[in-house]
Amino acid sequence: MSNEIVAKRYAVALFQIAKEKHVLEMFEEELGLVQSVFMKNEELHSFLTKPNISKEQKKMFLSNVFSSVSESILNTLYILVDNKRIEILPAIANEYVTLANEERNVADATVYSTRLLSEEEKLNIAEAFAKRTGKDAIRVKNIVDEDLLGGIKVRIGNRIYDGSLQGKLARIQRELMKNR
């Protein structure tokens, strides 16, 4: 079975537990924390995937490193160690966020701009795209892209809304070429 399918199954199980316990946000934050530590620390990843280190040692290590996370998240990490699938943790976290967002009718947007946006600008973008996408809310993450000449690009899921200067120039060029 592919890692993507397996990650989705783990995420669905965690999502169902979180929904039953009314802790969707808490699990999302904890998974984000675990994912962040896992992605930034190559030594942790290396340690957890070494075959010569016992599962018990790995679990003890995880319980020390992630002592602040809930029992359900920690147990999931233990199961991943037992099943030698710890490398799919980032995919599980991403899939969980997708499920939680669907439940709350929220979307995550990545906004690429030439400078950091103010909170008011982020709020305006969130409101405009919430209406456009039919979502109750949009959570905006701003990334400064030095390659942009001006304007913004907004990525929500698989969709990109290009309001950048390059995008506008490309559209004008296509129109001019089409009308020749």
Swiss-Prot record:
Q: Where in the cell is it found?
A: Cell membrane
From which domain of life does this come? Answer: Bacteria
Role according to the record: F(1)F(0) ATP synthase produces ATP from ADP in the presence of a proton or sodium gradient. F-type ATPases consist of two structural domains, F(1) containing the extramembraneous catalytic core and F(0) containing the membrane proton channel, linked together by a central stalk and a peripheral stalk. During catalysis, ATP synthesis in the catalytic domain of F(1) is coupled via a rotary mechanism of the central stalk subunits to proton translocation.
Q: Which family does it belong to?
A: Belongs to the ATPase delta chain family.
What keywords are annotated for this sequence in UniProt?
Answer: ATP synthesis, Cell membrane, CF(1), Hydrogen ion transport, Ion transport, Membrane, Transport
Q: Kindly give the SUPFAM superfamilies that the UniProt entry links to this protein.
A: N-terminal domain of the delta subunit of the F1F0-ATP synthase
Quaternary structure and partners: F-type ATPases have 2 components, F(1) - the catalytic core - and F(0) - the membrane proton channel. F(1) has five subunits: alpha(3), beta(3), gamma(1), delta(1), epsilon(1). F(0) has three main subunits: a(1), b(2) and c(10-14). The alpha and beta chains form an alternating ring which encloses part of the gamma chain. F(1) is attached to F(0) by a central stalk formed by the gamma and epsilon chains, while a peripheral stalk is formed by the delta and b chains.
Chief location bin = membrane
- The protein's name: ATP synthase subunit delta
One Pfam family it belongs to? OSCP
- Membrane topology label: Peripheral membrane protein
Record-level Gene Ontology MF annotations: proton-transporting ATP synthase activity, rotational mechanism
NCBIfam families assigned: ATP_synt_delta (TIGR01145), PRK05758.2-2 (NF004402), PRK05758.2-4 (NF004403)
GO CC term (a single one): proton-transporting ATP synthase complex
